[in-house]
């Protein structure tokens, strides 16, 4: 084995030289130079100082502007709450531990941090899945003239939390466990060891299939069908300038949504699965640290893609920040664009974009 396994940790370095120490007791500067830990601190501080205000502003403008409190926007509020969850309970801890060079809060603190970080990340992940399903139902109408209500929206939100708990809670009760990962200053599920007491193999397979593969399939299917629907409607209207603009806007938004999701979760899932299937293989601390930080960065670009790129949300935010005035003019576009002359207007960008 090319790593060192302790009672509740796994350090990706052999202890033949005797330098490996518990990540709960000593700085881990033998894994990476101190400046790399400071770089992590700077990165986490950037995420906190940018993601926290944007997500708080999302909640504020939704509360202040009644026109934003529509059932199709509930999941965006849930996404903002999940991102705030990650920032408050995950990023702040990582910042402090990275500054010290090791996980100073001990095994119990590691389990708590790992749980909250996983919970927030999973709520955000499943919010994107529910968002894709909602857009598919509203635009593609697989159930006919289905009326999407507040009850359906709340059911979708409840589903995200149930799925998140089903992923984050098991390691607290003996199905896998949380331990320091990467540079040993943040915690995640145990992908590294064969310990039969924790049944890590079955948990990792469960997590990979249920909490990554299935969301990817659902998102690709939902947004793929949505784009096809928009193009069909545009073709029926003989590619007028309006329908072409709507088609391009919808396609661009969908591509950004899918790329954002894949950028956040694919690197982490792939590296974690590689470590899981190659236990004992040689890998550096940064191999797991970098993908983990990719997933954390979703708390910043999620609101950018799903909120700030939406005209209605963006204009309401500008109005709120500027004390009731919009210095850029009134370009508010309601998410309930009038459905009158053409079929494509029923699948316009304002309906399939995240508002």
From Swiss-Prot:
Q: Could you list the residue ranges that cross the membrane?
A: 37-61, 74-99, 114-133, 153-176, 203-230, 253-276, 285-309
Q: Which PROSITE patterns match?
A: G_PROTEIN_RECEP_F1_1, G_PROTEIN_RECEP_F1_2, OPSIN
Biological process according to GO: absorption of visible light; cellular response to light stimulus; G protein-coupled receptor signaling pathway; light absorption; phototransduction; visual perception
- The name of this protein is Green-sensitive opsin
Q: In which tissues is it expressed?
A: The color pigments are found in the cone photoreceptor cells.
Q: Tell me the organism.
A: Gallus gallus
Record's Gene Ontology CC terms? photoreceptor outer segment; plasma membrane
Report any Pfam family annotated for this entry.
7tm_1
Give a yes or no for keyword Transmembrane helix in this entry.
yes
């Amino acid at each position: 084995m090319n790593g060192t396994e302790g009672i509740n940790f796994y350090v990706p370095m052999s202890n033949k030289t005797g330098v490996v120490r518990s990540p709960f007791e000593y700085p881990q500067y033998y894994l990476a130079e101190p400046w790399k830990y400071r770089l992590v601190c700077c990165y986490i501080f950037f995420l906190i100082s940018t993601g926290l205000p944007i997500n708080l502003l999302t909640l504020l403008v939704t509360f202040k502007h009644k026109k934003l409190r529509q059932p199709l926007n509930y999941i965006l509020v849930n996404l903002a709450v999940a991102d705030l969850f990650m920032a408050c309970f995950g990023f702040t801890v990582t910042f402090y531990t990275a500054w010290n060079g090791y996980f100073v809060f001990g095994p119990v603190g590691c389990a708590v941090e790992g749980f909250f970080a996983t919970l927030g990340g999973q709520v955000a992940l499943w919010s994107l899945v529910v968002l894709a399903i909602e857009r598919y139902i509203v635009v593609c109408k697989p159930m006919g003239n289905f009326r999407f209500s507040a009850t359906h929206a709340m059911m979708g939100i409840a589903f995200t939390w149930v799925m998140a708990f089903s992923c984050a809670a098991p390691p607290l009760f003996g199905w896998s466990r949380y331990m320091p990962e990467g540079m040993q200053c943040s915690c995640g599920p145990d992908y590294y060891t064969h310990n039969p007491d924790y049944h890590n193999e079955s948990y990792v397979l469960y997590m990979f299939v249920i909490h990554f593969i299935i969301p990817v399939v659902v998102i690709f299917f939902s947004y793929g069908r949505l784009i096809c629907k928009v193009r069909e409607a545009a073709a029926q209207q003989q590619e007028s300038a309006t329908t072409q603009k709507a088609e391009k806007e919808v396609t661009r938004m969908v591509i950004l949504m899918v790329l954002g999701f894949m950028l956040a979760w694919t690197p982490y899932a792939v590296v974690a699965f590689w470590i899981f299937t190659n236990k004992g293989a040689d890998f550096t601390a940064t191999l797991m640290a970098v993908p983990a930080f990719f997933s954390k960065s979703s708390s910043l670009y999620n609101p950018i893609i799903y909120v700030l790129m939406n005209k209605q949300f963006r204009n309401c935010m500008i109005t709120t920040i500027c004390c009731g005035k919009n210095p850029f003019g009134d370009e508010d576009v309601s998410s309930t664009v009038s459905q009158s002359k053409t079929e494509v207007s029923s699948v316009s960008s304002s309906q399939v974009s995240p508002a």
